[in-house]
Every structure is written in structure tokens, then in C-alpha cells.
Swiss-Prot record:
Domain of life: Eukaryota
Record keywords: Cell membrane, Cell wall biogenesis/degradation, Membrane, Transmembrane, Transmembrane helix
UniProt keyword annotation of Cell membrane present: yes
Name recorded for this polypeptide: Casparian strip membrane protein 2
Residue spans, topological domain Extracellular: 68-96, 151-184
rRNA processing keyword on record: no
Length: 208
């Protein structure tokens, strides 16, 4: 009888209980969630890093526009006993507003850098991104308005207006016109980057 029991092998199948199945399902689900979560955070962190780089570029453009326009001054080498031919940015209110607006935008961009770093550390912080969107939009209005007003004056300086007897001055004040034209271009670049920052933050919040 012992030999028969040794020859035959019996397999005992222990059915898996419902609690064990439930635990294994929970473990698999938690593993999938843990695998997906870093991906979403990594994507948002990448967007935040790109946001930080764009802010530095916008800051450089706004500072260049402010410094270039604020230091623009040219005096012609010839003068009379009563007149000296000079052109300065503060002779025109549009250029003065240009310097003030781009200076404010530069200061804001400097202050926004720590908040941009905070979104890199905490990529799921939607409140910070919403705050940046609001102020970025205000700075877009400032820089775009200043650049547009200055561009109108630069156009008149280059081409004049025969109907109002406004003569083009860029043939005489060549250096002055080149500097103010470069400042206007830099301001438009800053405005475009700020617009892109608003769109980028809005997309990140929408996919939050």
C-alpha cells in the first residue's frame, strides 16, 4: 500500500480567494498609477523649464529695448549762433512712454523668475501659473502699446509726412534713427515672447 501511494502523485489545488485577487489588482493598479504620474509631472516640468528660458529671453529683449532707447541722443556737428541741432528720446512723449513701459516689463520679468522656478519644483501648482498668466497679459499690453507708438514715430522719422509738412530727419540723424529702430524691434520681440508665455501657461493649465 505504501508503494502504491509512492507511485501516484496527487496535486492539491488551492483556489485563490477573492481578497487575494483584489489585493493583486490593487497592487497592479497602484503600480500603473505610479508609472504614469512621473510622466505627467515630467511633461509639466519640461514646460516650466521652457517657460523659465523664455522669460530670460524676454527679459534680455526688454532690457535691450529700454537701455538702447534710454541712451539714444545725437547732436549734429554743425550749429548756428542760436540753434543747436539735437535729437533725444525724451523730446518725444512716445519714446518716453516706451522707456517706462519696457522698464516696467523688465522689472516684472525679473520678479517673475522665482515664480517660474517654483513651477519647476512644483509642476502641478496651477495657482502660480494662473497668476503668471494674468501679469504676463498685462505686460503684453504694455510692451505692445509702447512698441506700436514708438514704431509710428520711427516711421515718420524715416519717411516724414508731406501733408503735414513733417520732414524726414533720419538723413541727418542717422545714428539716432538706427538706435530707436533697434529698440522698437527688441520691444516687439519681448511682446511676442510674452504672448507665447501666456499661451504656454494656458495650455499647461488646461491639461492640468
Amino acid at each position: 500500500m505504501d508503494s502504491k501511494s509512492g507511485r501516484s502523485e496527487s496535486a492539491i489545488n488551492i483556489p485563490e480567494s477573492n481578497s487575494t485577487k483584489h489585493k493583486s489588482t490593487v497592487v497592479h493598479t497602484a503600480t500603473k498609477v505610479a508609472a504614469v504620474a512621473p510622466r505627467g509631472g515630467g511633461w509639466r516640468r519640461g514646460v516650466s523649464i521652457f517657460d523659465f528660458i523664455l522669460r530670460i529671453c524676454a527679459l534680455a529683449a526688454a532690457l535691450a529695448a529700454t537701455a538702447t532707447m534710454g541712451t539714444t541722443d545725437q547732436t549734429l556737428p554743425f550749429f548756428t549762433q542760436f540753434f543747436q541741432f539735437q535729437a533725444s528720446y525724451d523730446d518725444l512723449p512716445a519714446f518716453t512712454f516706451f522707456v517706462v513701459a519696457n522698464g516696467i516689463a523688465s522689472g516684472y520679468l525679473v520678479l517673475s523668475l522665482p515664480f517660474s522656478i517654483a513651477t519647476i519644483v512644483r509642476p502641478h501648482a496651477a495657482a502660480i501659473k494662473l497668476l503668471l498668466i494674468i501679469f504676463d497679459t498685462v505686460m503684453v499690453a504694455f510692451t505692445a502699446a509702447a512698441a506700436a507708438a514708438a514704431a509710428a514715430i520711427v516711421y515718420l522719422a524715416h519717411n516724414g509726412n508731406s501733408k503735414t509738412n513733417w520732414f524726414a530727419i533720419c538723413q541727418q540723424f542717422n545714428d539716432f534713427c538706427q538706435r530707436v529702430s533697434g529698440a522698437v524691434v527688441a520691444s516687439f520681440v519681448a511682446a511676442v515672447i510674452l504672448i507665447f508665455l501666456v499661451v504656454l501657461s494656458a495650455v499647461a493649465i488646461r491639461k492640468h
